[in-house]
Amino acid sequence: MTTTEQRLTVESRNGIDYKVADLSLAEFGRKEIRLAEHEMPGLMALRREYAEVAPLKGARISGSLHMTVQTAVLIETLVSLGAEVRWASCNIFSTQDHAAAAVVVGPHGTPEEPKGTPVFAWKGETLEEYWWAAEQMLTWPGEPANMILDDGGDATMLVLRGAQFEKAGVVPPAEDDDSAEYKVFLNLLRERFETDKTKWTKIAESVKGVTEETTTGVLRLYQFEAAGELPFPAINVNDSVTKSKFDNKYGTRHSLIDGINRGTDVLIGGKKVLICGYGDVGKGCAESLAGQGARVQVTEIDPINALQALMDGFDVVTVEQAIGSADIVITSTGNKDIITLDHMKAMKDKAILGNIGHFDNEIDMAALERSGATRINIKPQVDEWTFDDGHSIVLLSEGRLLNLGNATGHPSFVMSNSFSNQVIAQIELWTKNDEYDNAVYRLAKHLDEKVARIHVEALGGTLTKLTKEQAEYINVDVEGPYKPEHYRY
């Protein structure tokens, strides 16, 4: 038995595998799930539409996505459409423990006799625990997983790199400059290779497709495709308009300030704020903080995004120009080493630093941890790091997603958009698999519009209907789609 297995074991009750913080939290979680269902009209509409069809029957979906109340509604939607599901979180801090417990127990079970879905997630996992949970999510009794639902690409990477190393006959040793997380990742694969030399290959051969939620994970998929390493089709859910223009912007606009407020309780009005990146997420960040009265500056590499920021009223600067005067610094780029150790040393005393991109490498956490700076934990996911000159910075969620680490993430309504796309994408790949090559695709425009229509109606909006003559004049169908693929919303 390996070191990891000695400390971490799968629990099982009433035939349900799980590893969560506390099953007794299930009643609290179920109450919040019921409220969330009311705010997630897209998912509830899909349940009604496909209730008699069960289009996902036979699908064994391994899901790696933040284990929140909203995700619980997604999981139970997949199950209601016929799928079997196993789940883990895609972030060590993002799990809401009452939601995880409620999913395991299920709507008709009890903590003593759960009747729900296997979940392996709890808030505050170590890196070793995180990757152990990811493996459990992908480890099915009997036949392997045949679908992946991913957020950030960790589940996909675990399967593909595991299969790649099995083919090579060896898991490579970690390099000195590899991140702590990558070392844990390699160690898990090495331990598993010692006991099962074909595990990941079998899973890779079984999987029919993957649907990916985030910008970071989509980038990984395109890299796998370009290298000829993608063994199954993938749908890029992130770039569905009803995901990227809503979750990324409006969700962030809500949850960023929630995380900052819960983590620090500082007044945002009047503060100097630096937002690194002005994509959809960065736009939501800037808008939310400016709305609180902050004085916002933006960094950008792309002149188009930079021009948008200027036209929206924000100065465009470099990190080096603004880091010394900023009271709050937020990274939202999807890239690495945006805030380096030198940048952190140059920040004001007690300045706040946080990330709302997917991974913790936007802020060079490895360099900070090696620097000799002392760390004092103020409260969960809030740390004060003091440098040798005596000044300190306040770091949120250890450089990981502060909106999920310090708060509860995006609200239910906006996640209904994103998760409706996930469900539709899973149905698409599962039921029409032979129509897709091993490449990365986007959902069709009419499906994007379908998701939007449901939510317009839920908010009480009334859509104008084209006449036949008007539709012919602009060369579209009366029922849509109304825009070409190249249209920029």
Swiss-Prot record:
<feature type="binding site">
    <location>
        <position position="213"/>
    </location>
    <ligand>
        <name>substrate</name>
    </ligand>
</feature>
<feature type="binding site">
    <location>
        <position position="335"/>
    </location>
    <ligand>
        <name>NAD(+)</name>
    </ligand>
</feature>
<comment type="similarity">
    <text>Belongs to the adenosylhomocysteinase family.</text>
</comment>
<keyword id="KW-0378">Hydrolase</keyword>
<dbReference type="Pfam" id="PF05221">
    <property type="entry name" value="AdoHcyase"/>
</dbReference>
<feature type="binding site">
    <location>
        <begin position="356"/>
        <end position="358"/>
    </location>
    <ligand>
        <name>NAD(+)</name>
    </ligand>
</feature>
<dbReference type="GO" id="GO:0004013">
    <property type="term" value="F:adenosylhomocysteinase activity"/>
</dbReference>
<feature type="binding site">
    <location>
        <position position="248"/>
    </location>
    <ligand>
        <name>NAD(+)</name>
    </ligand>
</feature>
<dbReference type="GO" id="GO:0005829">
    <property type="term" value="C:cytosol"/>
</dbReference>
<dbReference type="InterPro" id="IPR036291">
    <property type="entry name" value="NAD(P)-bd_dom_sf"/>
</dbReference>
<feature type="binding site">
    <location>
        <position position="68"/>
    </location>
    <ligand>
        <name>substrate</name>
    </ligand>
</feature>
<dbReference type="InterPro" id="IPR000043">
    <property type="entry name" value="Adenosylhomocysteinase-like"/>
</dbReference>
<feature type="binding site">
    <location>
        <position position="403"/>
    </location>
    <ligand>
        <name>NAD(+)</name>
    </ligand>
</feature>
<dbReference type="Pfam" id="PF00670">
    <property type="entry name" value="AdoHcyase_NAD"/>
</dbReference>
<dbReference type="InterPro" id="IPR020082">
    <property type="entry name" value="S-Ado-L-homoCys_hydrolase_CS"/>
</dbReference>
<feature type="binding site">
    <location>
        <position position="151"/>
    </location>
    <ligand>
        <name>substrate</name>
    </ligand>
</feature>
<feature type="binding site">
    <location>
        <position position="243"/>
    </location>
    <ligand>
        <name>substrate</name>
    </ligand>
</feature>
<dbReference type="InterPro" id="IPR042172">
    <property type="entry name" value="Adenosylhomocyst_ase-like_sf"/>
</dbReference>
<dbReference type="GO" id="GO:0033353">
    <property type="term" value="P:S-adenosylmethionine cycle"/>
</dbReference>
<comment type="function">
    <text>May play a key role in the regulation of the intracellular concentration of adenosylhomocysteine.</text>
</comment>
<keyword id="KW-0554">One-carbon metabolism</keyword>
<dbReference type="InterPro" id="IPR015878">
    <property type="entry name" value="Ado_hCys_hydrolase_NAD-bd"/>
</dbReference>
<feature type="binding site">
    <location>
        <begin position="214"/>
        <end position="216"/>
    </location>
    <ligand>
        <name>NAD(+)</name>
    </ligand>
</feature>
<dbReference type="GO" id="GO:0071269">
    <property type="term" value="P:L-homocysteine biosynthetic process"/>
</dbReference>
<feature type="binding site">
    <location>
        <position position="247"/>
    </location>
    <ligand>
        <name>substrate</name>
    </ligand>
</feature>
<protein>
    <recommendedName>
        <fullName>Adenosylhomocysteinase</fullName>
        <ecNumber>3.13.2.1</ecNumber>
    </recommendedName>
</protein>
<keyword id="KW-0963">Cytoplasm</keyword>
<feature type="binding site">
    <location>
        <position position="300"/>
    </location>
    <ligand>
        <name>NAD(+)</name>
    </ligand>
</feature>
<feature type="binding site">
    <location>
        <begin position="277"/>
        <end position="282"/>
    </location>
    <ligand>
        <name>NAD(+)</name>
    </ligand>
</feature>
<dbReference type="GO" id="GO:0006730">
    <property type="term" value="P:one-carbon metabolic process"/>
</dbReference>
<comment type="pathway">
    <text>Amino-acid biosynthesis; L-homocysteine biosynthesis; L-homocysteine from S-adenosyl-L-homocysteine: step 1/1.</text>
</comment>
<keyword id="KW-0520">NAD</keyword>
